[in-house]
UniProtKB/Swiss-Prot annotation:
Gene symbol of the encoding locus: NBP35
Major localization class: cytoplasm
Binding positions (ATP): G85, K86, G87, G88, V89, G90, K91, S92
SUPFAM superfamilies: P-loop containing nucleoside triphosphate hydrolases
Molecular-function GO term, any one: 4 iron, 4 sulfur cluster binding
GO cellular component terms attached to this protein's record: cytosol; nucleus
Name of the protein this chain belongs to: Cytosolic Fe-S cluster assembly factor NBP35
Cofactor note: Binds 4 [4Fe-4S] clusters per heterotetramer. Contains two stable clusters in the N-termini of NBP35 and two labile, bridging clusters between subunits of the NBP35-CFD1 heterotetramer.
């Protein structure tokens, strides 16, 4: 077993990588054609770049790691990306609850992968923030939260809990590749992939590397107000351009449930109809609306399952309905 300090050494020792996974002397320029491109080292952006000679000498063609990733993830039946147009809508919280909810079915083996490299919060919400990753002959072994719920995050590799990850996109992409290629999940029914908010390098990398192994699709999280829906439209446009199937949309923080009387009131007014209206407009499946329950935050802080602690909460009921709709969307019913 390796300590957190040793694992931290592994990730700090990672070279700066270009977007296609090759070791370079410095981060690639903005309009880099990519070291695997036929134009590598020859384009206008290559002139004056410290990587020019390296890129010209590299073999061209498909990334060989894609085949290894496909082989590693072959035992995973369903891969679901959790996306959001902006931060603060509860995407990571919902990813954690999705892991808890799916693993409530003891017949399912579930994995949760935290690819929000600069803001890894899933280990805290799953109650395993102080765990470390084991490395064996078969690869990195994820941390098991329960017998049928495993998690993987860069948080397990940081030397300190509050250590910041200050990386450029290329280095983050390199770690994503290692997570997909080297984490030994064994057989899983579901792999829930929590991604950063927005549409960034990480999203492009994830989609490129997982295309061959097959992604069931994306679950998109929003809140009711128009300022969130504006960014969700951009996220949905990204999915369309990247060829990612949208499994459906979840409206989080949809009203407030009083823990005492369980009456529901509106907090974020859906000025344009909220997530449901957006789904009707764009022809997307509306997976459900989850109300605010302050106890969700307390459970996330303490690393316990809100669904187990408060099974009768309207929020718990709504989450389980979303899970049923998700399983239906991937054909698992």
């Amino acid at each position: 077993m390796q300590t957190s300090a040793e694992m931290g050494g592994i990730i700090e020792a990672m070279p700066a990588l270009a977007q296609d996974g090759y070791a370079l002397e410095q981060a690639p320029p903005e309009h880099c054609p990519g070291p695997a491109s036929e134009n590598a080292g020859k384009g206008d952006a290559c002139q004056g770049c410290a990587n020019k000679d390296i890129c010209e000498s590299l073999p061209k063609g498909p990334d060989p790691d894609v085949a290894l990733i496909t082989q590693n993830l072959a035992p995973v039946r369903h891969k679901v990306l959790v996306l959001s147009g902006k931060g603060g809508v509860g995407k990571s919280t919902f990813s954690a609850m999705l892991g808890w909810a799916l693993s409530a079915d003891e017949a399912l083996q579930v994995g949760v992968m935290d690819l929000d490299i600069c803001g890894p919060s899933l280990p805290h919400m799953l109650g395993c923030v102080n765990e470390t990753v084991h490395e064996s002959s078969v690869g990195w072994t994820p941390v098991y939260v329960a017998d049928n719920l495993a998690a993987m995050s860069i948080q397990f590799m940081l030397p300190e809990d509050d250590s910041a990850v200050i990386w450029r996109g290329a280095k983050k992409n390199a770690l994503i590749k290692r997570f997909l290629k080297d984490v030994y999940w064994d057989e899983l029914d579901y792999l829930v992939v929590d991604t950063p908010p927005g549409t960034s390098d990480e999203h492009i990398t994830i989609n490129t590397l997982l295309k061959e192994s097959g992604i069931d699709g994306a679950l998109v999280v929003t809140t009711p107000q128009e300022v969130a829906l504006l960014d969700v439209r951009k996220e949905l446009d990204f999915c369309r351009k990247a060829g990612i199937r949208v499994l459906g949309l979840v409206e989080n923080m949809s009203g407030f449930v009083c823990p005492s009387c369980e009456n529901e009131s509106t907090i974020f007014k859906p000025t344009t109809g909220g997530g449901r209206a957006l789904c009707e407009e764009l022809g997307i499946k509306f997976l459900g609306a989850v109300p605010i329950d302050p106890r969700i935050g307390r459970c996330c802080d303490s690393g316990e399952s809100f669904l187990d602690a408060y099974p009768d909460s309207p929020a718990s009921t709504a989450i389980m309905h979303v899970v049923e709709a998700l399983r239906d969307a991937v054909g698992d019913v």
